[in-house]
Amino acid sequence: MVRHKFHLTAFTGLLAAACLYLGACTGNGSRTGCPPEQVAQDTTLSAGFELDSIHLPPGFRISVYALIPDARSLCVSPSGTVFVGTRGDKVYAITDENHDGKADKIYRLASGLDAPNGVAFRNGSLYIATISTIFRLDSIESRLEHPPSPVVVYDRYPTDRHHGYKFIAFGPDGDLYVPVGAPCNICEPGPPYASLTRIRPDGTGFEIFATGIRNTVGFDWNPIDGQLWFTDNGRDNLGDDIPSDELNNAPRPGMNFGYPYCHQGDIPDPEFGKGKDCRDFTPPVKKLGAHVASLGMRFYRGSGFPPEFRNALFIAEHGSWNRTVPVGYRVVVARQDDSGHLADPVPFATGWLRDGDHVSGRPVDVQPLPDGSLLISDDYRGAIYRVTYSK
């Protein structure tokens, strides 16, 4: 298989400026806060991002909401504060104080962390997931300028970096759900690897909720029935077109989704699938495509988009890294009717991959805002985009 070499869009100056801006308040070391800084206006931020090349359905518009180096997972408080995890060592908060749909201030909440990809908000506290540890910042919205010292909630997750980024979210049961990816492309690891775990907010009650999951970096609960849905990335090195990434549904604990024995519900693994029957595992609800790298996903509960998008599922495709012809680099949407039937995903935001190999962005996560707009994080460009709709 040929590894494709991508052409980097010229944006070094923009990203360097963002790094200087965000790095100007480094404080006195790791895990310290810094005073807020004014963010440039939206028209300035969007300059150089080739947003004219991003294709959306009629009536939708995309703009740059904020520049955040290595931006990954997103979460939002009920009051609208946006929290951003990264693949670097920092965690940020963004506020829109005048409610004009543009980021007004950016706060650096913590630094010196080990890939703090995951962020989740509950009862005034921000939970942060690094490779092996869950931290908590209490009463964070009243302390953005001077963040508190992190409290260790749970520190017994594996330290493996392969598939070590952790997306986290609180479920309807009040537990914090935390994935543990397989520490490999394909292997037969023991617990807790290749699973989705959950713990109570205080770090007690560790439990493996589901198994047979290679690497999920996005999940959400369906607003219609409250059931858990998640993406899972298929294994590599079986060719360009198999196996597919998966969209899975886990309505109850104890389900096994097949890894490493069976992929996409119907392909036995050539090494570990011998003697296994794919019918013994839970198949995906949807096959999302091979190597598209399906990451963040959210059900849309807002009212800012047309009615047909109510309860629709948005999925960020980070894009392939080793496919002969690149795929992904987009956001797709699967509409859902009132009975809970989910349609096949179709393109929603495309254009970060052009001319076969010209990459100008890599979507990671999607997050609806209280005003009904949709945020998209991009760790390749160090940006967060905002999608709005108007007739």
Residue ranges and their predicted role:
Residues 26-391:
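Beta-propeller domains with acidic blade repeats across secreted/periplasmic ectodomains
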